[in-house]
């Protein structure tokens, strides 16, 4: 008499045999553009309302050299300067 239990076939439930094989694709690759394109025009340089109306600055006139970009765009908010790449 044989005391060993009969050995049955053990099949894996996770493996599918004979199914279609498709190559796996990696994540999509995006190319970054070198130039920025805006839907609206960027703001123009120039200070709005600056001139002889400041007390003590009457003799200087309005033809001043802008040293800092904040002076040229002081009429804009900080997020607007960042939107157009000025800062």
UniProtKB/Swiss-Prot annotation:
Catalytic activity, as annotated: 3',5'-cyclic GMP + H2O = GMP + H(+)
Cited Pfam families: PDE6_gamma
Basic residues biased stretches: 26-44
Disulfide bonds: none
N-acetylmethionine found at: 1
GO biological process: one example: positive regulation of epidermal growth factor receptor signaling pathway
Record-linked InterPro entries: PDE6_gamma (IPR006952), PDE6_gamma_sf (IPR037030)
GO molecular function, one term: cGMP binding
Keyword set, alphabetical order: Acetylation, cGMP, Hydrolase, Sensory transduction, Vision
Record's keyword annotation contains Hydrolase: yes
Annotated spans, Disordered: 1-55
Source organism, top-level taxon: Eukaryota
EC number: 3.1.4.35
Residue spans of biased composition, Basic and acidic residues class: 1-12
GO cellular component, one term: plasma membrane
Protein function: Participates in processes of transmission and amplification of the visual signal. cGMP-PDEs are the effector molecules in G-protein-mediated phototransduction in vertebrate rods and cones.
PANTHER family named in the record: RETINAL CONE RHODOPSIN-SENSITIVE CGMP 3',5'-CYCLIC PHOSPHODIESTERASE GAMMA-SUBUNIT-RELATED (PTHR12122), RETINAL ROD RHODOPSIN-SENSITIVE CGMP 3',5'-CYCLIC PHOSPHODIESTERASE SUBUNIT GAMMA (PTHR12122:SF4)
Protein family per UniProt: Belongs to the rod/cone cGMP-PDE gamma subunit family.
Subunit (UniProt): Oligomer composed of two catalytic chains (alpha and beta), an inhibitory chain (gamma) and the delta chain.
Record disease entry: Deficiency in GMP-PDE activity cause accumulation of cGMP in visual cells. The elevated cGMP levels are associated with degeneration of the photoreceptors and blindness.
The protein's name in its UniProt record: Retinal rod rhodopsin-sensitive cGMP 3',5'-cyclic phosphodiesterase subunit gamma
Organism: Mus musculus
């Amino acid at each position: 008499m044989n005391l060993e239990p009969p050995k049955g076939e053990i099949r894996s439930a996770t493996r599918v045999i004979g199914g279609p094989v498709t190559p796996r694709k990696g994540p999509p690759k995006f190319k970054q553009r070198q130039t920025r394109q805006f839907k609206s025009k960027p703001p123009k340089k120039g200070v709005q309302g600056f001139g002889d109306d400041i007390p003590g600055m009457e003799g200087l006139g309005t033809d001043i050299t802008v040293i800092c970009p904040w002076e040229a765009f002081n009429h804009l908010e900080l997020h607007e300067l960042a939107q157009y790449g000025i800062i």
